[in-house]
Amino acid sequence: MAVKRTGQMSLAEALLGGRAAAGSSPLDRLASLVKWYRFDKLLAGLRDGGAGRLAWPPRMMFKALLLQSLYGLSDRELEEALADRLSFRRFAELGLEEAVPDHTVLNRFRNRLIAQGLLDKLFAELDRQLERAGVMLKHGAMLDATLIEAAAAPRSRGRPSHDPEAEFGGKGGSTFGYKAHVAVDAGSGLIRTVITTPANVGDTTVADALLRGDETVVMADAAYDSKARRARLAAEGKKPRIMRRPNRHHPKLPPRLQRYNGLIARRRAAVETTFATLKNRMKLTRIRYIGLAKASAQILLAAMAFNMRRWAALTG
């Protein structure tokens, strides 16, 4: 089966003296850090372009979706950016005179990644590269969660939502959408684990699933606090650094525990920086697609893009 050839230097690029083929932008630096060929085996099964059609190279398509996540673009905006922006073409290995995949092709590729369960495997491969590069420090895990609005309007009296898997969550049930639960590496700020659920799932429900097993310290806010969790972590040889919350026996925390909470809050500030980058710089404020599987894909791709961005910052 024929595969579209990309990344070949055209006459226009040759006349530019190679500036179109290489550069020193932040995207060029990011692209140079990642061993992209290690993703090729995972993506190899996505080459089928259908009867009578040339297939787009899977690596190029994957890199395009990472660009989308880095800059918070819609599928249509990504198509336009690939056509117009030289740095995007270089990153995706598209020549100046080559056609770009349209938004429907990009959407179908993402759907195939979801259908074949490849996104978790791609995330795991990037995680391995981060470990080999020595930037994943494993000094501990910081647990937290953030709400992200659904693409569809919420259900109202007599009218169901177009997204039946989204739910209301947050204080007073004010957000209709999904929740991204993350474990962030305490030493580097890199995302180690991410799980997406409907917004009404409690933070503590998936907390144990966020842990990888090699953590020495687990930090979290009071939403994750329970006597059983603290005891279990200690039994596993992990230091539970979970903020304490008042209970019916102790409605007000003593000064000692207030100071303890303050120390943990300061150490946990890095996870808030992670969410700020995802939402403010990468525009992960709204799910663009319908359903839990696609919401999870958008968040997982954003986590991969964030980790690549963070990798470049840590080694810059």
Regions found by a protein language model. Name each.
Residues L46, M61, E79-E80, R90, ...:
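A detector of single, family-specific signature residues
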Residues A20-Y71:
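Basic, short loop/linker segments at the boundary and entry of helix-turn-helix/winged-helix-like folds
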Residues A51-R59, G172, I290-A297:
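Structural motif
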Residues R53, P57, R76, A83, ...:
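Polybasic low-complexity intrinsically disordered regions
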Residues M1-D40, W311-G316:
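Charged, often Cys/His-bearing segments associated with DNA-binding zinc-finger transcription factors
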Residues T216-V217, A222-A293, L300:
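Helix-centered, glycine/charged polyanion-binding patches within enzymatic domains
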Residues R286-G316:
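C-terminal extensions of enzymes
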